[in-house]
Regions:
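Flexible "stalk/tail and boundary" regions
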Residues: 1-24, 32-87, 91-92, 99-149
Length: 149
């Protein structure tokens, strides 16, 4: 779903940060990413991690869905909608993640997580799963990035 409709106001999430999930399923968002306090954010269950997306990603997906036929459009919107929830960053800079989804991706209360900047969105990984996945993802990303550097 390539989309070039990015502006100076489009959020940019960079770097990796480590943090802990508290007893209320909240994780502190890194200070450089807190501009998103003013933005609508959505959390999406992505198999082995959670993705936190700005509204622009949701709108991009909706434009893609609009290109599909009736039943395909309904199916893809249902699949997306059932794995996505709206979230907010509170005044203390914390994001509450859905407990059931957190547990599905290996995140428990008081456990360590890795927040991974992915430019257009950020990911929340259980620390141990991120360590397992990181080498493969980093190698693939480095190979693809070499085409642009």
């Amino acid at each position: 779903m390539p989309d070039t409709a990015h502006t100076a106001d489009t959020p940019v999430f960079m770097r990796d940060y480590r943090n802990a999930v508290d007893a209320q399923w909240r994780v502190t968002v890194p200070a450089p990413w807190r501009f998103a306090e003013r933005a609508e954010l959505f959390v999406r269950l992505k198999g082995d991690h959670l993705a936190v997306l700005p509204r622009s990603d949701v709108e991009r997906f909706r434009r893609h869905a609009d290109t599909l036929s009736g039943t395909d459009r309904t199916a893809v919107l249902t699949a997306w909608g059932s794995t996505t929830d709206q979230v907010k960053i509170d005044s203390a800079g914390r994001l509450t993640i859905p407990a059931d989804w957190a547990q599905k991706v290996g995140i428990e209360k008081s456990s360590k997580v890795v927040l991974v900047g992915a430019i257009e969105h950020f990911q929340i990984w259980a620390e141990d799963r991120h360590a397992t996945d990181e080498s493969g993802l980093q190698k693939r990303g480095a190979a693809l990035l070499a085409q642009y550097d």
